[in-house]
From Swiss-Prot:
Keywords: Calcium, Calmodulin-binding, Cytoplasm, FAD, Flavoprotein, FMN, Heme, Iron, Metal-binding, NADP, Oxidoreductase, Ubl conjugation, Zinc. Belongs to the NOS family. NADP(+) binds at R750, T929, T984, R1017, S1046, R1047, K1053, Y1055, Q1057, D1090. The keyword Ubl conjugation applies. This is Nitric oxide synthase, inducible. Residues 515-535 are annotated as: Calmodulin-binding. Residues 55-66 have a biased composition (Polar residues).
Length: 1154
């Protein structure tokens, strides 16, 4: 056959038809192959090619040369200017003109009316299996085009060699129906395919690819040996080198050489019996295939999968990768020691194994290749994707972030730290990795080079922009043109979905259901479910929360109502009030915040709902409130919603439920939920309502089964900070007591301490004035010892043990994650709450442990709400007092470790400025003592305040800083402020005036007027920080100081709200209304309520506002973050009934939050 000159020369007499219809997706004329243009490419003649045969593959390398195309005249385009696409960088303003796209091969998936650019594996980038060879008339022009491209890469023209090669390829195709690439051509093709890969950000290294020619192998064993050689070379003890191994090309499609693995090294994923996934979820299907083929799984999180290799179209064979070939990097963080507890690791070599190399009409379905990692590939995609290891929320919790609030940006902060850990870990082990910023910069340099050398650069913007950092990377602002050039790496259909099995006995049984059939079945079931759900009564479930507790219960409620209704769970701030006119059933689960207010994400709905005047749709509703009965406005927001909906004409489905944090909140919710669900089924006449199977959550037994728990000896020493960090998801650190000072005079019967803590390092942790310190206290030794003396069948008090629980099916024991391994004495001292009165649920379980029948009956009686509340508020018993009241109780160590509640941290407003005291944190602590039973009962002590008062200098204090973004000094320091804080409410204001003092003396900054309103009993008894206040007033930090004394002899009681009305009415009006200033209130809930009431009266009088207008005025103040409240000091109900007074321990802002 003569040389096909028509593929080598162009007929110059052709004219360009400027009216030809264009393919708008590829910028070429439809039905017309765009003309070639000069290309600057690698010079393969500088490589050292290997020879074919049965020898080991030889490394083939090459370097880049740039020069004009010597055969450009042979491949000259028609006499018309080449069409170009202008590409702009919107960050720098630089533009490129892309002409290379005219050489694009085939069409992309996009259509004239839809863009498919974000499809993961589009058909245009995928090559499926073949059942016959490529016809010679299709193969020949592609082969000649590649040969032209190859010889066009030389610096000097080699026309005779070029023409001879074209002639040889032509004859080979005519004779055999195909042709073979030379070693140099293979090197050129693999590198050029990498250069053309639009989804790769690291192409600047394309010319440094190491090529292993394995086209001579014939068996799976030989393939395995080649791959082992590849992995060893590429890993290089961590100094990763890019490489590719090329197995024999496809012939008739029935004798393919393929690697079935997606990557040469990848972790297994196991579908466990309970539905959970252990390991990498992305590998579940392939892992099961390996098991079906005979692999023995290990069932750990990071098991390296075996290689599944197919040679010459035969059935695949399994090969375990030698462990010494797999370099793995254990993950750690440069600052967070707990990161190692996650026990994460990742393999060092990213080697894609299942793509196909297309070159000159030839297809190589087996061509595993590797580069090195960009940090985000591991830190974002592998670790944080919800369909992968999904560690983001766990890391966020351990960092102490507000993971229940999307607006807190906890995801962004956590994902950055995970990526910091990945980069740090790889670099510490001297393993090659590149951060995404450097990768983006290198791609921009590569792109400039490509436009300069060959007039274009195919690029997929969606894939090249890193998964984090977005617009702060340069690639984000770069317009890109995406097209397919040849040679090219294509995706393939998974091998196990198309393989024709020669031994049917080895075919995995799990593939008996074809994928298409399965999809159709799932789709059909989905349609049926949608129809079923659409025919059900719609139920909207709204929640408002500060800590996430209400959201959790709302989701549980949604699971219950999905058994018979069509529920939708929404946060209140996502709900449109206009939808009330369309509701059939509305359910609300909400906490109450502060002084009877709504949580932050309920404010918008609250305001809109209260302003609503009428409702034409009379739907059904039910409300459940969460809170703490220690607060006088218990569940107030929930009752406000109930009252308003009733006023609007909606019908109450069930009485408003109340979940008391101190009295069986979960049990109360479950009871209310089931009652509401049954009532809804009756009202809406749900079909089969008496036979509905409800979730196990609502039917599970509340009994204690000792056979489900056991204690096992453990030798691991207790790291207290590490344990507390893990349990509470807080970044715990240790401060040490520097000093204590009683701020009250010797005349006072009460104690208020200034606690000064010093840090172990050079500087205290970062905090702002107004923020809180969470302190982890210890229980009193006497209480701990009393309980230890009553434990039966327990280990030695100081013997470290771990609690294990029996799994649901009873087949194995698992470590209980609630507590760390520790001794019983340590658990009772540091981790378990032994002072809060037992809940009704705990009493019910204790009843099972009573050996005296009378005591058992008494405990069961106390489980009833009326008896329980009277007993609880009269005695407020500690757990030791319960054991003393019911001496026949036989309580085991496993019962204590599994059933007692967790000891919570206590929060105190920080009373110092970090700028003024960089190595210290100060607290203002009221030490709580009180007697129960109307003063006749045993003496009780506040847990944390008493513990702090007992410390000696240098004793450790485990703690953490909690943000209080709503209670900080104004960003504009010139704004005037009014500070209102009686008693220990002065605590955060001390940090305010210390900060202002530092700014004035060290930075020369003068703040706006700061007026302080303080309240106490008598000046000579409990005027806290009196001398400091006078000094701050003398230095001009405090503009004025006003004090309200409530216990002066022969004088009427004066409170802070009286000072506001009598002395500061004009100042309040100026600060809040005229000068856009700020007002801060810190103290117990009753004081905050009275202050708010007085302020509203004052402003209503001054501005002539009615009740609704003044409520809206203060709502706007809070929305503008100019009215700040830090409320603490819960009120005990039994004391409220007695005299309306109450002590306040612990300082717990937000104790009435969900």
């Amino acid at each position: 056959m003569a040389c096909p000159w028509q593929f080598l020369f162009k007929i110059k007499s052709q004219k360009v038809d400027l009216t030809t219809e264009l393919d708008i997706n590829n910028n070429v004329r439809k039905g017309h192959q765009p003309p070639s243009s000069p290309v600057t490419q690698d010079d393969p003649k500088r490589h050292s090619p290997g020879k074919h045969g049965n020898e080991s593959p030889q490394p083939l390398t090459g370097t880049v040369k740039t020069s004009p195309d010597p055969l450009g005249k042979l491949d000259a385009p028609p006499s018309a200017c080449p069409r170009h696409v202008r590409i702009k960088n919107w960050g720098s303003g630089v533009t490129f003109q892309d002409t290379l796209h005219q050489k694009a091969k085939g069409d992309l998936s996009c259509k004239s009316k839809s863009c498919l650019a974000s499809i993961m594996n589009p058909k245009s980038l995928t090559i499926g299996p073949r059942d016959k060879p490529t016809p010679p008339d299709e193969l020949l022009p592609q082969a000649i085009e590649f040969v032209n491209q190859y010889y066009g890469s030389f610096k000097e023209a080699k026309i005779e060699e070029h023409l001879a090669r074209v002639e040889a390829v032509t004859k080979e195709i005519e004779t055999t129906g195909t042709y073979q690439l030379t070693g140099d051509e293979l090197i050129f093709a693999t590198k050029q395919a990498w250069r053309n890969a639009p989804r790769c950000i690291g192409r600047i290294q394309w010319s440094n690819l190491q090529v292993f020619d394995a086209r001579s192998c014939s068996t799976a064993q030989e393939m395995f040996e080649h791959i082992c050689r590849h992995v060893r070379y590429a890993t290089n003890n961590g100094n990763i080198r890019s490489a590719i191994t090329v197995f024999p090309q496809r012939s008739d499609g029935k004798h393919d050489f393929r690697v079935w693995n997606a990557q040469l090294i990848r972790y297994a994923g196991y579908q466990m019996p309970d539905g959970s996934i252990r390991g990498d979820p992305a590998s579940v299907e392939f892992t099961q295939l390996c098991i079906d083929l005979g692999w023995k799984p290990k069932f750990s999180r990071f098991d390296v999968l075996p290689l599944v290799l197919q040679a010459d179209g035969r059935d695949p064979e399994l090969f375990e990768i030698p462990p010494d070939l797999v370099l793995e990097v254990p993950m750690e963080h440069p600052r967070y020691e707990w990161f190692q507890e996650l026990e994460l690791k990742w393999y060092a070599l990213p080697a894609v194994a299942n793509m196909l190399l297309e070159v000159g009409g030839l297809e190589f379905p087996g061509c595993p290749f590797n580069g090195w990692y960009m940090g985000t590939e591991v830190g974002v995609r592998d670790f944080c994707d919800v369909q992968r290891y999904n560690i983001l929320e766990e890391v966020g919790r351990r960092m102490g972030l507000e993971t229940h609030k999307l607006a807190s940006l906890w995801k962004d902060r956590a994902v950055v730290e995970i990526n910091v850990a990945v980069l740090h870990s790889f670099q510490k082990q001297n393993v090659t990795i590149m951060d995404h910023h450097s990768a983006a910069e290198s791609f921009m340099k590569y792109m400039q080079n490509e436009y300069r050398s060959r007039g274009g650069c195919p690029a997929d913007w969606i894939w090249l922009v890193p998964p984090i950092s977005g617009s702060i990377t340069p690639v984000f602002h770069q317009e890109m043109l995406n097209y397919i050039l040849s040679p090219f790496y294509y995706y393939q259909v998974e091998a196990w979905k198309t393989h024709v099995w020669q031994d049917e006995r080895r075919r995995p049984q799990r593939r008996e259901i074809r994928f298409k059939v399965l999809i159709k079945a799932v789709f059909f079931a989905s349609v049926l479910m949608q129809k079923a759900m659409s025919s059900r009564v719609r139920a909207t479930i709204l929640f408002a929360t500060e800590t996430g507790r209400s959201e959790t219960l709302a989701q549980d409620l949604g699971a219950l109502f999905s058994c018979a209704f069509n529920p939708k769970v929404l946060c209140m701030d996502q709900y449109q009030l206009s939808h009330l006119e369309e509701e059939q059933l509305l359910l609300v689960v909400t906490s109450t915040f502060g002084n009877g207010d709504s949580p932050g994400n309920g404010e918008k709905l609250k305001k809109s709902l209260l302003m609503l005047k009428e409702l034409t749709n009379k739907f059904r509703y039910a409300v459940f409130g969460l809170g703490s009965s220690m607060y006088p406005q218990f569940c107030a927001f929930a009752h406000d919603i109930d009252q308003k909906l009733s006023q609007l004409g909606a019908s109450q489905l069930a009485p408003t439920g109340e979940g008391d944090e101190l009295s069986g909140q979960e049990e109360a919710f479950r009871s209310w939920a089931v009652q509401t669900f049954k009532a809804a089924c009756e009202i809406f006449d749900v079909s089969g309502k008496h036979h509905i199977e409800i979730p196990k959550l609502y039917t599970s037994s509340v009994t204690w089964d000792p056979h489900h728990y056991r204690l096992v000896q453990d030798s691991e020493p207790l790291d207290l900070n590490k344990a507390l960090s893990s349990m509470h998801a807080k970044p715990v650190f240790t401060m040490r007591l520097k000093s204590q000072q009683n701020l009250q005079s010797p005349k006072s019967s009460r104690t208020t301490l200034l606690v000064e803590l010093s840090c172990e390092g050079s500087q205290a942790p970062s905090y702002l004035p107004g923020e809180h310190l969470g302190v982890f206290p210890c229980n009193q030794p006497a209480l701990v010892q009393g309980i230890l003396e009553r434990v039966v069948d327990g280990p030695a008090p100081h013997q470290p043990v771990r609690l294990e629980t029996l799994c649901e099916n009873g087949s194995y024991w698992v470590k209980d994650k609630r507590l760390p391994p520790c001794s019983l004495s340590q658990a009772l001292t540091h981790f378990l709450d032994i002072t809060t009165p037992p809940t009704q649920l705990l009493l019910r379980k204790l009843a099972q442990l009573a050996t005296e029948e009378a005591e058992r009956q008494r405990l069961e009686t106390l489980c009833q709400p009326s008896d329980y509340n009277k007993w609880k508020f009269t005695n407020s018993p500690t757990f030791l007092e319960v054991l003393e009241e019911f001496p026949s109780l036989r309580v085991s160590a496993s019962f204590l470790l599994s059933q007692l509640p967790i000891l919570k941290p206590r929060y105190y407003s920080i009373s110092s400025s970090r700028d003024l005291r960089p190595t210290e944190i100060h607290l203002t602590v009221a030490v709580l003592t009180y007697r129960t039973r109307d003063g006749q009962g045993p003496l009780h002590h506040g847990v944390c305040s008493t513990w702090l008062s007992s410390l000696k200098p240098q004793d450790p204090v485990p703690c953490f800083v909690r943000s209080a973004s709503g209670f900080q000094l104004p960003e504009d320091r010139s704004r005037p402020c009014i500070l209102i804080g009686p008693g220990t409410g002065i605590a955060p204001f001390r940090s305010f005036w210390q900060q202002r003092l530092h700014e004035a003396e060290h930075k020369g900054l003068q703040g706006g007027r700061m007026t302080l309103v303080f309240g106490c009993r008598r000046p000579e008894e409990d005027h806290l920080y009196w001398e400091e206040m006078l000094e701050m007033a003398r230095k001009g930090v405090l503009h004025e100081v006003h004090t309200a004394y409530s216990r002066l002899p022969d004088q009427p009681k004066v409170y802070v709200q009286d000072i506001l009305r009598q002395r500061l009415a004009g100042e309040v009006l100026r600060v809040l209304h005229e000068e856009q200033g700020h007002l801060y209130v810190c103290g117990d809930v009753r004081m905050a309520r009275d202050v708010a009431h007085s302020l509203k009266q004052l402003m209503a009088t001054a501005l002539s506002l009615d009740e609704e207008q003044v409520e809206d005025y203060f709502f706007q103040l809070k929305s503008q973050k100019r009215y700040h409240e830090d409320i603490f000091g819960a009120v005990f109900p039994y004391e409220m009934k007695k005299d309306g007074a109450a002590p306040s321990d612990p300082r717990a802002p937000g104790a009435n939050r969900s």
